[in-house]
């Protein structure tokens, strides 16, 4: 008889209470929030910026794997099997026969998607893991305000049938780019995804409104909600309770307090 201690491994996500719906998860993690605060600070520069992005996404992807990915029971001989027939581990692991696609939305999503891809290759069967690439551009008006998004090009390796499709994109500002990319996968890429999940460092109420309206089936994981331009009566209330009054975007569609344009700072675009 084997020990059944790990036959059903519990995992409970630590998340902030809110009123945005069951598919939105605002991860409550003091360590990651500390790292994110450093990442967004004015004096933080390269190479620390990209190092922090790597660390944050490594932990965020692990959180999503723990919370969302299916598991299976395994019986695996350990190195002690040569000494005793009891040298066998039996318990749950992440199902290695899971198909997963991570989507790089360039530029800001390039490093997060690579981190996600590398970690997935060590978690499930690498032959079932794929990374796709989308070139996305913001459309701006004469006042430099964002008015939309357009796809400039894409490298999509195949279908997404029964796959977990992950979109690691640091800043959920307007939701325009992600919504457009997700719509592309829903309408142009063959197959029906098993689950679509976005992984964001920071999101705004406006982003959540758009995503939950246009893609109510999509699951959202974020480390922080920024609503810094909301009226005073919003502060101190539970996120989403006064959703219509919450505001996290300035007139140029940048997040406040935010951390600036991540596509720029991650690539030293100002040099």
Model regions and ranges:
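PRPP-associated nucleotide enzymes
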Residues: 1-271
């Amino acid at each position: 008889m084997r020990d059944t201690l790990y036959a059903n491994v519990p995992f409970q996500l630590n998340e902030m209470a809110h009123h945005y719906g069951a598919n939105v998860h605002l991860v409550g993690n003091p360590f990651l929030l500390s790292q994110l605060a450093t990442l967004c600070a004015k004096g933080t520069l390269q190479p620390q910026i990209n190092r922090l992005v790597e660390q944050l996404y490594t932990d965020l992807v692990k959180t999503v794997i723990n919370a969302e990915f299916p598991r299976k029971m395994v019986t695996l001989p350990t190195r002690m099997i040569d000494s005793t027939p009891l040298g066998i581990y039996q318990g749950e692991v992440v199902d290695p026969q899971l198909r997963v696609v991570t989507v790089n939305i360039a530029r800001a999503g390039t490093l997060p998607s690579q981190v996600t891809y590398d970690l997935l290759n060590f978690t499930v069967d690498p032959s079932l893991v794929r990374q796709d690439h989308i070139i996305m551009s913001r459309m701006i008006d004469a006042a430099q305000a964002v008015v939309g998004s357009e796809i400039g090009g894409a490298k999509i390796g195949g279908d997404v049938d029964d796959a977990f499709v992950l979109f690691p994109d640091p800043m959920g500002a307007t939701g325009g780019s992600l919504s457009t990319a997700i719509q592309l996968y829903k309408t142009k890429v063959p197959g029906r995804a098993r689950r679509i999940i976005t992984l964001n460092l920071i999101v705004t109420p406006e982003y959540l409104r758009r995503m939950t309206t246009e893609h109510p089936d999509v699951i959202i994981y974020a480390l922080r909600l920024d609503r810094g331009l909301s009226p005073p009566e919003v502060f101190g209330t539970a996120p989403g309770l006064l959703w219509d009054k919450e505001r996290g975007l300035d007139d140029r569609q940048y997040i406040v307090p935010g951390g600036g344009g991540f596509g720029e700072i991650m690539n030293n675009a100002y040099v």
